């Protein structure tokens, strides 16, 4: 009953990333049918349990949307391969990081290294021994950078375990993907994620048709959720925000 793949929506143009994503693990499993045939990173309730297999399998495949690619610092040419671009965007969140995936029988081990001064590099570190947010954000980067135009991605709590600057960088990637034809639906409790979308609108990375924000609160009498569609100006301001909408600092 927890397998969602039987629904037509779950195809190679769709990914669902739940708040209950896999964090750092000792090893990650393989599912060739899921990853190769269906191009999915999750099998059970959006847990992204096959994201590392996906990244390993498609690591040398160029990303579908070239304009999402960024350069390695100091290089003139862009490496469009998926692993390279995931690593480069991850470096914007966690500087100097390098990704290493080892095949162990039918499983995979995820490790990281970090560039240091004087062209030296640290020893390999297990994902278990690095910051939780590094591994937690990987499925988001993988999903967006492997997405085709007109794909749909649902992401719960993209801010989880990521510091505010990292959230802003993540929203930069999300906004760029949206502007290039990827539909991304986010559930968030972070003002940095909200503000990132508004900044993207103000800076004309996205246009007003690309952004809609809904706020949900609870009707205390009926004990049901009530949604509010927020009015957003072209300059990235929310007009007349409802009571309770990130107003704790007022």
Feature locations, PLM:
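RecA-like P-loop NTPase motor core
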Residues: 77, 92, 96, 100, ...
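Walker B catalytic motif
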Residues: 155-158
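Conserved D-loop beta-strand region of ABC ATPase nucleotide-binding domains
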Residues: 187
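Phosphate-coordinating catalytic segments in nucleotide- and nucleic-acid-processing enzymes
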Residues: 1-137, 143, 148, 231-250
